């Protein structure tokens, strides 16, 4: 059974869930993707609970980690994650990041290269600058108005059907999106800000070297962005 806790930052309060079994047990840190929340990993948490230490969060400004000022970048998220790990006395975790969560994991590896026991990327892509074009970076910075003006019902439909093939997966994504029902402005802010800080992290042109054992997972039916192409390269 996971316990809900909070972590204070200058921009707001982060909510996270953990089951710290013992300091000698391996810790799995689950990081959901952009606009998703901790429920994304419900099935994985259910499977691994009791076998590993587990930490999963609602990312800054997402779901219960609100209100939150959009005055942070990808590296701030990685630093706050490290603060949570230090608070829970966790050393050498395995980070498991889906999409945006995978980018947070890479930023963490850049800042703390010797603190990871492993890194698993799920439908994410490399942060290295050479993988993206200047046009792609420019587009990433311009996404907020798209999400703000896209009809909500169509966004809900494309957002659920485009990210999963199973009924469970689509229903779960719909539930997570419905957190923002009636507040599309907040949803657009989260998405727009997320893409923007992703572009800025790429522009830093850092090595983003993963020094620990790593596993790249990309679904054969994943058509989000250029994920398959990036991982193949």
Put a short name on every predicted segment.
Residues 1-13:
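N-terminal cap/lid segment of alpha/beta-hydrolase-fold proteins
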Residues 11, 55-97:
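Active-site loop/oxyanion-hole signature of alpha/beta-hydrolase fold enzymes
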Residues 12-67:
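Conserved HGGG/HGGXW glycine-rich cap/lid loop of the alpha/beta-hydrolase fold
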Residues 43, 107-111:
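Active-site signature of alpha/beta-hydrolase-fold catalytic machinery across serine-
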Residues 97, 101, 105:
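Gly/Ala-rich beta-loop-alpha elbow adjacent to hydrolase catalytic centers
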Residues 110, 117-149:
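Flexible "cap/lid" loop of the alpha/beta hydrolase fold
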Residues 130-132, 150-209:
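Conserved alpha/beta-hydrolase catalytic His-Asp/Glu region
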Residues 192-232:
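Conserved serine/cysteine hydrolase catalytic core
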